[in-house]
């Protein structure tokens, strides 16, 4: 919560879930749509304006791949899960799920995993490590390589 103060009012649940080896985690929510129009003017024929509004959800679910539970070292598992959680929380903060539920023409204009996004995940992860008194990591590439090596230890890509 210290790294994401803007998400304090939201309900965020997390759990392990069986999923494909291609993904480490995912975030899910229900996006409510409201149709806003004046029924009288629509039926009489005076106005034909109908607006669809998407309401920002208040509850989210983050799922972590249950295969990560095979990591024996609890401290390593905790760091990898925290990194994945920060990644998914940043999607929530950027309201990417609301954009993804729009039509494709709007969606393709908003690139989600741009370089700044991954850099922001790395910065937030380092901020969390600093708050917990753990040494910070200098480069994002080092973190990516370390995570890949840990995943190789549990035969991540050889299932």
Region spans (language model):
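Walker B catalytic acidic pair
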Residues: 88
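Active-site-proximal or metal-binding-adjacent scaffold patches in catalytic folds
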Residues: 1-83, 92-159
